Regions:
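Fold-independent oxyanion-binding glycine-rich loops
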Residues: 10, 49, 70-73, 90, ...
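Short helix-capping/linker segments at secondary-structure and domain boundaries
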Residues: 10-14, 132-139, 165-166, 401-410, ...
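Generic C-terminus detector
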Residues: 516, 530-531, 536, 540-581
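Glycine-rich oxoanion-binding loops at beta->alpha junctions
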Residues: 65-82, 261-271, 295-331, 467-483
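Active-site phosphate/pyrophosphate-binding segments
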Residues: 257-281, 371-489, 499-500, 564-581
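Acidic/histidine-rich
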Residues: 154-185, 438-462, 497-499, 504
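Glycine-rich phosphate-binding loops that contact phosphosugars or nucleotide phosphates
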Residues: 275-415, 446, 493-537, 556, ...
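Conserved short alpha-helical segments that host acidic/polar catalytic motifs at enzyme active sites
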Residues: 1-244, 248, 263-264, 268-276, ...
């Protein structure tokens, strides 16, 4: 949520770098964008509501050696030009990702000092507070160190002081921020992919660290103003992974990368021992939560270990009765999900083992968990996850298999990439043509199929904006069936050997009430009257079926959203990385 980019250097125009960086941060979700740069020792600010293209249209043909930019996803204050970042108060101009919980208290104090405010944001209050401190001590590092103790909540700041127009300052707590290191130029950014066009060298900034950045030097301080040494890391991925490479959208490109993702994941060594634990809590949000449900079914079935799957935003408020030896598994694509991170901190504080399953190396969750397994999906830009979700469920399936007495069918495992490509190359447009005019679409399944239905339904509503719900098939007759009328689409997922006939019985119940039944299965269906459309999944061993079953559900969602003319990569109101609670 929100994206920050900053540049100081002599090789490029900061305006061009910042606009390019903001475009690479669009996937994080935003409703306004802005930029601040220095011209003739004065800070120039431009802000616009809507897409970055709106901001570009008002920019002058200026050149500058230093600047900061921001994409805002509204939290405090509506998405208006006045509330968009950057904000300038006195000599301080800043951009901010996060939430200052005590900003109203600070605002009241600042108003008593004579400060006035043009926006409703906590960010403008932060700018005023830093300006007030700087007036007192004439020292930016000291001023920011005071902020570390005074600001409650989460934040990542990029700051320009109009009295020091060759310096960027940065500060973070519980919100992602990295420093990009170049030659005669340096950067600040919310993530590494946004600056890969310019450098693959970066410094991870930890909580409460303050950074002073010039074109030649990066100096990092702790909250007591002591200089600390930081290691420079090198991003080893392919920079082309953050480009569309000829595909019409990032989401379609990422779906087409799934075969390679599965190949890499299946060849990776997953050696973590879960058999020493009596119980496992999986904490996650959104699609990662659905991946956790798949993991629960696999671990309980194959390893005979009790698994609880918990929505992270609720888990942190629960009372925890850790009995025996417990493991908390935190699943997050970005590794920055605020609610999930909070759960890890709770477990760590109670001396419970934690395992992160994340896609981004060096991310916050990867750093705070006692153990980590990296999914090998590579950068994922589309807001709606596809390949990262697939990597998560594959990792969990392989983790369960390797900790059980079961031996996976290696022939099926090796054929998975081929089967995935076969499913991707099927034509789902005629089905999408029927679905895209509907107001409601339902998914039903049992057991692990129900978990896949939940993900399929989420994917559909995320990008098509059609109301969709997933229900346990056995609950259909307990109320949900009243929603079904003539022509209501019901997508039935039925791959479980044990539960197949029961699920088919539920499909018949829906069809008898007029439902248009779309059956997704790997079985030979004898009674064709059960369904109106059939999507066949290649036959593989039961442990691997979820990997194949989700592919057509992703592509149906994609084709429906495309027919509706939606912005598939950047659905309205959504953010890729949810970094506030």
């Amino acid at each position: 949520m929100c994206g920050i980019i900053g540049y100081v250097g002599e090789k490029r125009c900061s305006i061009d770098v910042i606009i390019d960086g903001l475009k690479h941060l669009e996937y994080r979700g935003y409703d306004s964008a802005g930029i601040a740069y220095v011209k003739d020792n004065n800070v120039v600010i431009e802000r616009e509501v809507g897409r970055i293209s709106n901001l570009e249209s008002v920019l002058k043909k200026d050149t500058s050696h230093i600047g900061i930019g921001h994409t805002r996803w509204a939290t405090h204050g509506k998405p208006t030009k006045e509330n968009a970042h950057p904000h300038k108060v006195g000599n301080i101009t800043l951009v901010h990702n996060g939430i200052i919980d005590n900003f109203m208290e600070l605002k009241s104090t600042l108003m008593s000092e004579g400060y006035t405010f043009k926006s409703d944001t906590d960010t403008e209050v932060a700018a005023a507070y830093i300006d007030s401190l700087y007036k007192e001590n004439n020292d930016m590092i000291k001023s920011l160190s005071i902020c570390v103790n005074k600001f409650l909540g989460s934040y990542a700041f990029g700051i320009i002081n109009e009295l020091e127009t060759d310096v960027l300052y940065a500060l973070r707590k519980d919100s992602p921020l990295i420093i990009g290191v170049g030659e005669n130029e340096n950067f600040i950014a919310s993530d590494v992919p946004s600056i890969l066009k310019y450098t693959n060298k970066y410094i991870d900034i930890e909580n409460d660290e303050i950074v002073k950045i010039t074109k030649d030097e990066v100096t990092v301080y702790d909250k007591n103003c002591n200089i600390i040494n930081k290691e420079i890391s090198v991003f080893e991925g392919d920079a082309n992974l953050v480009e569309k490479n000829g595909y019409e959208t990032y989401m379609l490109k990422e779906i087409h990368e799934e075969a390679e993702v599965i190949k890499k994941t299946s060849e990776a060594s997953i050696d973590f021992d879960i058999t020493k634990y009596d119980e496992i809590d999986i904490v996650a949000c959104g699609s990662a939560y659905h991946a956790g449900l798949v993991g629960k079914y696999m671990i309980e079935k194959l390893c005979n270990i009790k698994v609880n799957v918990c929505i992270a935003s609720e888990y942190q408020y629960d009372k925890h009765f850790y009995k025996g030896k417990t493991l908390v598994i935190a699943i997050s694509q970005s590794g920055e999900t605020a609610d999930t991170k909070k759960c890890v901190n709770i477990a760590n504080d109670m001396d419970v083992d934690t395992l992160g399953i994340v896609n981004v190396k060096g991310s916050s969750i990867a750093r705070i968990c006692k153990h980590v397994i990296y999914t090998l999906a590579g950068p994922e830009i589309a807001v709606a996850t596809t390949k990262a979700y697939l990597a998560q469920i594959t990792t969990l399936i392989l983790l369960a298999v390797k900790n059980s007495k079961e031996k996976i069918n290696t022939e099926d495992l090796q054929k998975l990439p081929y089967y995935i490509e076969t499913l991707i190359n099927k034509d789902y447009t005629s089905l999408a043509n029927m679905l895209h005019t509907k107001d409601d679409i339902y998914f039903i399944g049992r057991g692990i199929d129900y978990a896949l239905c939940m993900e399929g339904s989420l994917k559909l509503k995320e990008i098509s904006y059609i109301h969709s719900e997933a229900y346990a098939a056995g609950e259909l007759k307990h109320g949900t069936i009243s929603l079904i009328s003539e022509g209501t689409p019901v997508i039935v997922v039925a791959t479980s050997d044990e539960l197949y006939l029961k699920t088919i019985s539920n499909a018949k119940e829906a069809k008898a009430r007029g439902a248009y039944v779309i059956l997704v299965t790997d079985k030979e269906v004898i009674n064709e009257g059960v369904y109106d459309e059939l999507i066949s999944i290649p036959k593989v061993t039961e442990e691997l079926r979820p990997i194949l079953t989700i592919i057509p559900l992703q592509l149906i969602s994609y084709e429906v959203a495309k027919l509706k003319g939606n912005d598939i990569d950047k659905p309205k109101n959504l953010a890729k990385s949810v970094t506030v609670e």
